[in-house]
């Protein structure tokens, strides 16, 4: 029986060396005594959760963060032993499950903590207190709520507060007024807490890269870990070169010559102005290569060539400058020769952010993990295979 990891020549390459380099540089930037929390939610922003987590931990991260309890349990089942914080809301009836898997939750309201205490019948629940300083998503907002939290902890010794944090709404923007307001508000709200015994974190990638101090004792490193800028506004403020880890590739599955006046793809929106070589690429919007990318450049033999016509669910066509043999490599995100298509370029075409592009590339696209140019592992959820070297 074949052990080939995938049977369609479309794949993403994840450079674990790049992730390690970004983590190592960030650790040097924030200082040896500040914890680096590697954010690997949403399958590590589409890069591969367990593989990214292991690389980050090897490079100096001391703990992990995810968005939902399911992600944390998945990491535990894949063998990750490092501390894991769930940043999002977990219904209090599941706190025993979190404790079973040694997962730290976010306590985000007085009511949640009261219910969590009711459901913690044995053992203890570890949590970080979320403080809302202006994001208005999750968290306690007032000094009174903080005092109520402390009272709940006094009455419920099974509840163990291990950290406190907030999240900035505008840390990646040029205008710093709102960001600085949140920073000051955070310091005010946490003042009554026993901070000496807590992990205190407010800086995300944007704030962590921008700030020279004020990290408290932990920084959450998300988008920057993957070598992506938090925003274009920060281009001149990043203290070291971020190295992108994600590239996306396919091949020409079919090449044909169409005559002047013939059309391509649904809606017949593309019509050849002259006899033209057309290549078919087995990538479509079901893979996360969205229809709005019609007319976008891709790379073939180091040249920028444009997608012809509408993108289909599973395939798209490209206008070629000459005949190429089927099997010719195509790069959608990444480098060929002197040409480079960045995640930011694709985000610009989609009028969105690079975070969304990375998360949109679906699990139907196998991830190939490389280190120092060598393939270390290939993960294909469709075939439920992980092949390691």
From Swiss-Prot:
EC numbers for this chain: 5.1.1.1
Source organism phylogeny: Bacteria, Bacillati, Bacillota, Bacilli, Bacillales
Example of a GO cellular component annotation carried by this entry: cytosol
Entry keyword Isomerase: yes
Active site location: 41 (proton acceptor), 266 (proton acceptor)
Family indicated by similarity: Belongs to the alanine racemase family.
GO MF, one example: alanine racemase activity
Residues modified as N6-(pyridoxal phosphate)lysine: 41
Amino acids binding substrate: 137, 313
GO biological process, one term: D-alanine biosynthetic process
This protein's name: Alanine racemase 1
This protein's record includes keyword Isomerase: yes
Reactions this protein catalyses: L-alanine = D-alanine
InterPro entries associated with the record: Ala_racemase (IPR000821), Ala_racemase/Decarboxylase_C (IPR009006), Ala_racemase_C (IPR011079), Ala_racemase_N (IPR001608), Ala_racemase_pyridoxalP-BS (IPR020622), PLP-binding_barrel (IPR029066)
UniProtKB keywords: Isomerase, Pyridoxal phosphate
Cofactor(s) needed: pyridoxal 5'-phosphate
Gene3D superfamilies: Alanine racemase, Lyase, Ornithine Decarboxylase, Chain A, domain 1
Source species: Bacillus subtilis (strain 168)
Role, per record: Catalyzes the interconversion of L-alanine and D-alanine. May also act on other amino acids.
């Amino acid at each position: 029986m074949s052990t080939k990891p995938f049977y369609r020549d479309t794949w993403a390459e994840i450079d674990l060396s790049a992730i390690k380099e970004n983590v190592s540089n960030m650790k040097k930037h924030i200082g040896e005594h500040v914890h680096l929390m590697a954010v690997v939610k949403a399958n590590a922003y589409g890069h591969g959760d367990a593989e990214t987590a292991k690389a980050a931990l090897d490079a100096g991260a001391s703990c992990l963060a995810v968005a939902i309890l399911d992600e944390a349990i998945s990491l535990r089942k894949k063998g990750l032993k490092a501390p894991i914080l769930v940043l999002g809301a977990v219904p209090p009836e599941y706190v025993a499950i979190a404790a079973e898997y040694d997962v730290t939750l976010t306590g985000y309201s007085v009511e949640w903590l009261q219910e969590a205490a009711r459901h913690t019948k044995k053992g203890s629940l570890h949590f970080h207190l979320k403080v809302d300083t202006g994001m208005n998503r999750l968290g306690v907002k007032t000094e009174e709520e903080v005092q109520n939290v402390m009272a709940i902890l006094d009455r419920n010794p099974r509840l163990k507060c291990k950290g406190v944090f907030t999240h900035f709404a505008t840390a990646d923007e040029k205008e710093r007024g709102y960001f600085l307001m949140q920073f000051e508000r955070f310091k005010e709200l946490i003042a009554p807490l026993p901070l000496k015994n807590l992990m205190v974190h407010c800086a995300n990638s944007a704030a962590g890269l921008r700030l020279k101090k004020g990290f408290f004792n932990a920084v959450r490193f998300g988008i920057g870990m993957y070598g992506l800028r938090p925003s274009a506004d920060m281009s001149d403020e990043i203290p070291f070169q971020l190295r992108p880890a994600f590239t996306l590739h396919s091949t020409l599955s079919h090449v044909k010559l169409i005559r002047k006046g013939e059309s391509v793809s649904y809606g017949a929106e593309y019509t050849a102005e002259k006899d033209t070589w057309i290549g078919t690429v087995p990538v479509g919007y079901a893979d996360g290569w969205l229809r709005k990318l019609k007319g976008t450049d891709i790379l073939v033999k180091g040249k920028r060539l444009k997608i012809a016509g509408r993108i289909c669910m599973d395939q798209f066509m490209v206008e070629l400058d000459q005949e190429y043999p089927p099997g010719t490599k195509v790069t959608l995100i990444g480098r060929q020769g002197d040409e480079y298509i960045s995640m930011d370029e694709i985000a610009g075409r989609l009028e969105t952010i690079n975070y969304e592009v990375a998360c949109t590339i679906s699990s139907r696209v196998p991830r190939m993990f490389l280190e120092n140019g060598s393939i270390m592992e290939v993960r294909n959820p469709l075939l439920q295979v992980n092949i390691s070297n």
